[in-house]
Amino acid sequence: MLTGLSMADLSAQEKEIAIVAHRGFWNCDQAGLAKNSIAGLVQAQENDFWGSEFDVNMSKDGKLLVFHDGSVEGKSIEKNLASEFEYYRLKNGEPIPTVDQYLEQAKKYPETMLVYELKVHSNKKAESKAVRLSIEKLKEYDLFYPERVMFISFSKHICKEFARLAPGFTVQYLEGDARPDELVKYGINGID
């Protein structure tokens, strides 16, 4: 699935469209039809997509995994150790990527925007920890720049935390239950 974002006007008559690969450019043979895979990220990068969106969940031991759902085959990521997911495979045979593995590949294409979706967790304490760990990882891989990454989430708390800890970054709230004037008070500068 591809998602389009419009960018600022280049001139009065000309607009540029930015294409974001949702969960990577996974819907192709080269990526093995695997969402949130390293191969899907590579395909987005090599095909010059403006950005690539990916989903992040935190395990019980504070490890960040790139996976859309909060559970894998009924096993909660948040309630289990990351090591318990090492043997699960994506549709293309890849293991579930860690954020480290994903960011290592992301570094190779500085022109590709990372659309970092931090998933909802069970409580605000866990969400705050996941935000802090996410920022630490982005800094570790020298990717913590507003031109390289934007943050999105269905959790208002996560968005507030990213806005507080990463001023100047694009932070978009995905749930439809808040008005723009409410969100802007917290530094959240986008609604998707």
What are these regions (language model features)?
Residues 1-4:
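Bacterial N-terminal signal peptides
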Residues 6-192:
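Phosphate-group recognition and catalysis centered on beta-loop-alpha active-site segments
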